[in-house]
């Protein structure tokens, strides 16, 4: 849908800064109306006439939209290629889940990219959707996923999307502002249950959570780096261009492939804590306990 809308809108509006900003605003409005409005109407109809079907569909959508399992599966493909395959195979596997250039990455670089992706997407793909589902049910979760998908497709700071994708990127920053910070603290708390470095996770989270151009991306990366006692982030190539980025965490020990497995354990721990916290929040909203 987003790709089709982009193609149509680019043909309608002039190819200048104002036209691209206007077109970008229009695509944001249309995607938000569709992603939030359609599930709302479908569930409203089903709960009115076929309540059991409405419940089943809502549960199915919840399962489909929470990316915990897929995030683990994709990152573990990288781990498997690092342990049992070639470096080129590992580079290809990680290229499927990151936006940076991976052709020249070392084993350490591939591992760091996978760990960073697990950390960042624990918020975007799991904890943030759970929060929005707790507040507004599946329709609000769909709306959030629409915003997040727009950012992943349009939110690049290159010539093609600098203006066209600006509103989508800013809206994603707003939508993730609170969830990212909750996710960071849930990861810190998750170290208690995974045997990781709780003290360092809290220290690095508070110190390095702003070490990123995005106001949200470093939140979970900082908690993850501290929990694992490693250093993440740093300079990276995107579309053939080197971007200088600050590091996150201290290199107490070198990054190793096993950190991908550890990152997934921490992601699951944070997600389970999120289920508990957001379940209580949802119960409070639904049954008036927060009034």
Protein language model features and the residues they cover:
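Hydrophobic alpha-helical transmembrane segments
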Residues: 1-142, 155-291
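Active-site His/Glu-centered metal-binding helix of metallohydrolases
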Residues: 146, 150, 154
């Amino acid at each position: 849908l987003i790709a089709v809308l982009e193609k149509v809108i680019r043909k309608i509006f002039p190819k200048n800064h104002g036209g691209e900003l206007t077109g970008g605003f229009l695509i944001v409005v249309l995607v938000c109306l569709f992603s939030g409005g359609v599930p709302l109407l479908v569930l409203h109809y089903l709960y009115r006439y076929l309540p059991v079907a409405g419940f089943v569909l809502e549960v199915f959508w919840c399962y489909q939209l929470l990316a915990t399992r897929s995030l683990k599966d994709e990152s573990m493909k990288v781990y498997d290629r690092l342990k049992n395959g070639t470096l080129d195979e590992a580079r290809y596997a990680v290229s499927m889940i990151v936006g940076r250039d991976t052709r020249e990455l070392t084993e350490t670089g591939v591992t760091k990219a996978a760990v960073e992706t697990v950390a960042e997407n624990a918020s975007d793909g799991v904890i943030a959707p759970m929060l929005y589902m707790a507040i507004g049910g599946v329709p609000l979760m769909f709306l959030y996923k629409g915003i997040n998908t727009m950012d992943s497709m349009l939110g690049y700071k290159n010539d093609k999307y600098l203006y066209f994708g600006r509103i989508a990127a800013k809206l994603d920053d707003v939508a993730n502002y609170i969830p990212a910070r909750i996710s960071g603290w849930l990861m810190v708390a998750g170290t208690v249950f995974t045997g990781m470095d709780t003290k360092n996770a809290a220290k690095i989270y508070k110190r390095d959570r702003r070490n990123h151009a995005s106001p949200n991306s470093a939140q979970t990366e900082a908690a993850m780096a501290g929990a694992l006692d490693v250093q993440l982030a740093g300079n990276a190539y995107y579309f053939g261009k080197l971007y200088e980025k600050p590091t996150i965490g201290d290199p107490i020990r070198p990054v190793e492939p096993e950190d991908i497995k550890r990152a997934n354990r921490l992601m699951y721990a944070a997600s389970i804590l999120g289920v508990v916290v957001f379940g209580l929040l949802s119960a409070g909203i639904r049954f008036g306990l927060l009034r």
